[in-house]
Amino acid sequence: MKLQKPKGTQDILPGDAAKWQYVESVARDTFSQYNYGEIRTPMFEHYEVISRSVGDTTDIVTKEMYDFYDKGDRHITLRPEGTAPVVRSYVENKLFAPEVQKPVKLYYIGSMFRYERPQAGRLREFHQIGVECFGAANPATDVETIAMAYHLFEKLGIKDVTLHLNSLGSPESRAAYRQALIDYLTPMRDQLSKDSQRRLDENPLRVLDSKEKEDKLAVEKAPSILDYLDEESQAHFEAVKDMLEALNIPYVIDTNMVRGLDYYNHTIFEFITSVEGSDLTICAGGRYDSLVGYFGGPETPGFGFGLGLERLLMVIEKQGITLPIETEMDVYLAVLGDGANSKALELVQAIRRQGFTAERDYLGRKIKAQFKSADTFKAKLVMTLGESEVEAGKAVIKNNRSRQEVEVSFEDMMTNFANISEQLLS
C-alpha cells in the first residue's frame, strides 16, 4: 500500500509555509493593534459543544462533523469551527469574572475539520484565523471588528473586497420572520431542492443560503428580514451602517444572507471578492448575544469572525500579490576537506548566534556544487573554508554579487560578524 495523505488534506512545504507565516504574522500584528490576545483551544471537543451551539439541523452537524467515541465511550468531535470552542473556554475559565477587563478580545489561528467535498480553497482539514469579542453590546463593537478585518485585507494588499451586510435582529424579530418565510415558501415547497424541503421544516432561514438554482429562484421575491426588525434591532442596524459610513467602509445590504450557524443575531456580514469571475467569501461573522448564556455563563454579548487561510492565500495568488518574504541567506560556508569540518561547524554556529542566517555544506561536495547551493539559497556572502584556512586561523569572505572580498580572522567572525557584513555589503 502506498502511504499518502488523507483526501482533503495537504502538506504545506517550506516555500509555501513562508507565505502562511507572513499572513499569520500580519494578522497577529493587526489584532494586537486592536488589543486582542491569542487563545489556543483543543482540536477536539465534546460533541455537544458543537452540536448544541452550532445547531442540530445545520449542515455542519448533520453532514460534516468528524465525530467518534473514544476509549472511554465519550462522544468527541474534531472542531469544525472556532467560535463554539472559544465560548466554551470563556465560560469554563470564568473570563466573565469582574476582575477580567471587558470587553474580552481573543483571536485564534488553527486547524478546523469538516467532511465535505474537497475543492479549490476548501479542504477537509482547513486553517482558520478568527476573533471573538465578549462583553460589549455597543454597535461600535460590530463596526470595529468588521473594520479590523478590512484593515487586515488592506495590509495584505487584497483588492476588490465588498462588505455584504445584513441583520437577523432580535430572537423575537427572527421568530416573526421565520413564520413569514414559512408562509411564503410552503406553497412552492415542491419547487425546492430536497435539502431545502428539509430545511423548510427544520430551519427555514437556511433556504435563503442555498446555492441550488431552484432554491435561488424560489427566494428571489421572498420577504426581507429587515421588514420584521423590531425597534431596538432597527436602531442597532442603523447605528452599524452609520458608523461604517463614518469610517469610509463601503457595504451592500444582502437580505438573503443568513450565515450557516444558528447562534447569530443582529449584525451578520461577509467580505466577498471576485476571483476569475466568481464571487468568493473570504471572511464571515456576526453577533451572537445568547451563546455564552447557552454554555452556562452569564448573558454576555459577543461578536466575531472567521476567515480561511487557504482561501485567503488563494486570493493573494490569483490577484498577483507579491508578499514581502525575506528569502535571502546572510552567509554560506563552502567546506573543503575533513580537516575543516569541525571548524566550519564552530564558525557557522557563532555567526548564527550573532543573529545571522547561515548554512554550510555537510555532504563533502566539490566546490562548484557548493557555490551553486550558495546561489540557490541567495546567499549574500560566501566563505570558503579548507584545511589551509583552518591552519592560518582566517579565511576569505566575499560578496556573492559584487565579488568584493576580504580576509578575516576566525576570532573576528565569531565575535563581530556584523561589522564584516556591513563592510562587504555597504
From Swiss-Prot:
InterPro entries noted in UniProt: aa-tRNA-synth_II, aa-tRNA-synth_II/BPL/LPL, Anticodon-bd, Anticodon-bd_dom_sf, His-tRNA-ligase, HisRS-like_core, HisRS/HisZ, HisRS_anticodon
Gene3D superfamilies (alphabetical): Anticodon-binding domain, Bira Bifunctional Protein, Domain 2
GO molecular function, one term: transferase activity
GO cellular component terms listed in the entry, alphabetical order: cytoplasm
EC number annotated for this UniProt entry: 6.1.1.21
Top-rank taxon, per record: Bacteria
Catalytic reaction annotation: tRNA(His) + L-histidine + ATP = L-histidyl-tRNA(His) + AMP + diphosphate + H(+)
EC supergroup of this enzyme: ligase
GO biological process: histidyl-tRNA aminoacylation
Subunit structure: Homodimer.
Protein's name according to its UniProt entry: Histidine--tRNA ligase
Origin species: Streptococcus pyogenes serotype M18 (strain MGAS8232)
